[in-house]
Regions:
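Intrinsically disordered, low-complexity regions enriched in acidic/Ser/Thr/Pro/Gln residues
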Residues: 2-6
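Extended low-complexity intrinsically disordered regions
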Residues: 9-48
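Structural motif
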Residues: 24-28, 79-84, 124
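Amphipathic alpha-helical interface surfaces
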Residues: 31, 61, 84-89, 100, ...
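Generic structural signal for hydrophobic core residues of well-folded globular domains
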Residues: 39, 95-96, 136, 140
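Structured beta-strand/loop patches that form or line metal/cofactor-binding pockets in enzymes
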Residues: 47-68
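Conserved interaction-surface patches within small, structured recognition/assembly domains
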Residues: 66-82, 93-96
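C-terminal binding/interaction regions
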Residues: 80, 102, 107, 111-148
Length: 148
């Protein structure tokens, strides 16, 4: 792995920090509560963006994901009507938002396995998380391809 992949402020660093934070909790009930707390800390999401155009399909709950920026730095705003999914959004945004499109596309969501999330999410939440990541990476791929 090259140095930039693990430099402070990188997606890899964000994933490492998430794994360290979740290591503090021994019970999954504590981890779920932490996820809910993270979701509550998301910035307000504009009602005008809660449209079909920004909706992530494949999620059981309602999820919206809005990209902005360009290939040099992409920002994402997102929201859900579910408390736990909002926490998942907070983790995803921490890893992927405000990064270059190329880094977003190249970054695998290793934190999901690292914190044991994969085996504790229901199949519908796992599918929704995969759909959200696919949509986010799709936006980044499009931005990187257009050179915006």
């Amino acid at each position: 792995m090259n140095e930039t992949a693990t430099s402070p402020g990188s997606a890899a660093e964000a994933q490492r920090e998430i794994a360290e934070e979740f290591a503090y909790f021994t019970e999954w009930s504590e981890r779920y509560q932490y996820l809910i707390d993270l979701g509550r800390q998301l910035p307000p999401f504009p009602e005008a963006s809660r449209t079909e155009a920004w909706r992530v399909h494949g999620c059981q709950s309602m999820v919206w994901l809005v990209p902005s920026g360009d290939a040099s730095r992409m920002h994402f705003d997102a929201a859900s009507d579910s408390a736990i999914v909002s926490g998942l959004i907070a983790l995803v945004l921490r890893v992927y938002s405000d990064r270059p499109a190329a880094e977003i596309v190249a970054t695998e969501p290793d934190f999901i396995q690292a914190i044991g999330l994969a085996k504790h999410l229901s199949p519908t939440r796992s599918n929704g998380l995969a759909a959200m990541l696919a949509k986010l990476k799709g936006y980044a791929t499009a931005a990187a391809g257009s050179g915006e």
